[in-house]
Swiss-Prot record:
Pfam families recorded: ATP-synt_DE, ATP-synt_DE_N
Keyword Membrane appears in the UniProt entry: yes
Protein name (record): ATP synthase epsilon chain
Subunit (UniProt): F-type ATPases have 2 components, CF(1) - the catalytic core - and CF(0) - the membrane proton channel. CF(1) has five subunits: alpha(3), beta(3), gamma(1), delta(1), epsilon(1). CF(0) has three main subunits: a, b and c.
Keyword set, alphabetical order: ATP synthesis, Cell membrane, CF(1), Hydrogen ion transport, Ion transport, Membrane, Transport
NCBIfam families: ATP_synt_epsi, PRK00571.1-3, PRK13442.1
Gene Ontology molecular function, alphabetical: ATP binding; proton-transporting ATP synthase activity, rotational mechanism
Superkingdom of the organism of origin: Bacteria
Family: Belongs to the ATPase epsilon chain family.
Native organism: Exiguobacterium sp. (strain ATCC BAA-1283 / AT1b)
Chief localisation class: membrane
Keyword flag Methyltransferase: no
One GO cellular component term noted in the UniProt record for this chain: proton-transporting ATP synthase complex
Amino acid sequence: MNTVHVNVVTPDGAAFEGDARMVIAKSVTGELGILPKHIPMVTPLDVSVLKLRHEDGGRTLIAISGGFMEVRPDTVTILAETAEMADKIDYDRASAAKVRAERRLQDTKLSELEFRRAELALKKAINRLSIRDMKE
């Protein structure tokens, strides 16, 4: 078998469990492609779209809001704050969140912490919306 078992877990429980030929994830230092028998590693993940390529040529797209990835030769475990499958994303809600975050960022009275939170909210909304353009 030329696959790696993938588990995507959030505080709410398992978001995905299955096998993939390749896992493409964005760490805080850049994009990583994980194949079966990869050397063990742990890396922090950025807000991004996790891409799983399957043996049948299909793919699974999952919007994650950061977290950590543990890689073993036969297993990849993603621990994420949130994880949404592409077909479960409410794009109207994500668009509204983007508009709210953009408005908050225009407020000149925000503290540094509030500004960073608004930036993160915008990044998450843009990430969720970006999957729509990636769908086949």
